[in-house]
Swiss-Prot record:
Family: Belongs to the SIMIBI class G3E GTPase family. HypB/HupM subfamily.
Residues involved in Zn(2+) 2 binding: H100, H104
Entry-linked InterPro entries: CobW/HypB/UreG_nucleotide-bd, Hyd_mat_HypB, P-loop_NTPase
Ligand binding (Zn(2+) 1): C95, H96, C127
Subunit structure, interactors included: Homodimer.
GO aspect biological process, one term: protein maturation
Pfam families per UniProt: cobW
GO function term, MF aspect, one: zinc ion binding
Protein name: Probable hydrogenase maturation factor HypB
Length: 221
């Protein structure tokens, strides 16, 4: 197949996904649900961050999660233990969630009984960037253990983020990561995104993530 044909197919796929994403967002708005798409590589700390958010927000908000994984229900089972309603989504060989899959997951949730929806995307820093799920905010989680050049190597996904979380700052010295460089890279690539330096071991910076969630709720509602 010629390159032009391949590009046309890709454009059609993204266009169809955008229509479904807008449909998902309209449905969430109708029911007053504020949704967040958590993106990041495997091991960046997405699941643990979501668990901590559930623990700290569940007394104030009714929370549900959609957990994307290539196989099994590992992350979904972890989140359920923290008291959230969780819908697992297995993507098989696909490296990202899409609006079609999320739309089906929404059918398994009673949206009238949900205030916040946390969607954990498949662990990947490339594919998820192009596929709007219908969420209101996108959060990208990067860890110092991935290397301090990870942010500048993945500008595409960084440009889509509303919040960039630089996680595992407590391990920066051990792995030789320059936190300031990572922070500067994030701000240079996406000046509009908020940037938070985080350690889920010491909980440094976690209050700023909570503030972002709370502020987002006020913006959307």
């Amino acid at each position: 197949m010629h390159l032009v044909g391949v590009l046309d197919i890709a454009k059609d796929i993204l266009k169809a996904n955008k229509r479904l994403a807008d449909k998902n967002r309209k449905l969430l708005n109708k029911h007053g649900v504020v949704a967040f798409d958590f993106m990041g590589a495997i091991g960046s700390g997405k699941t643990l961050l979501i668990e901590k958010l559930i623990d700290n927000l569940k007394d104030k908000y009714k929370i549900a999660c959609i957990a994307g994984d290539v196989i099994a229900k590992f992350d979904a089972e972890r989140m359920e233990k923290h008291g959230a309603k969780v819908v697992p989504l297995n993507t098989g060989k696909e490296c990202h969630l899409d609006a079609h899959l999320v739309g089906h997951a929404l059918e398994d949730l009673n949206l009238d009984e949900i205030d916040l929806l946390f969607i954990e995307n498949v662990g990947n820093l490339i594919c998820p960037a192009d596929f709007d799920l219908g969420t209101h905010k996108r959060i990208v989680v990067i860890s110092t253990t991935e290397g301090d050049d990870t942010i500048e190597k993945h500008p595409g996904i960084m440009k889509t983020a509303d919040l960039i979380v630089i996680n595992k700052i407590d391990l920066a010295d051990a792995v030789g990561a320059d936190i300031k460089k990572m922070e500067n890279d994030a701000k240079r690539i996406n000046p509009d995104a908020e940037v938070v330096l985080l350690s889920l071991k010491t909980m440094e910076g976690f209050d700023k993530v909570l503030e972002f969630i709370e502020k987002s709720v006020k913006e959307v509602k």
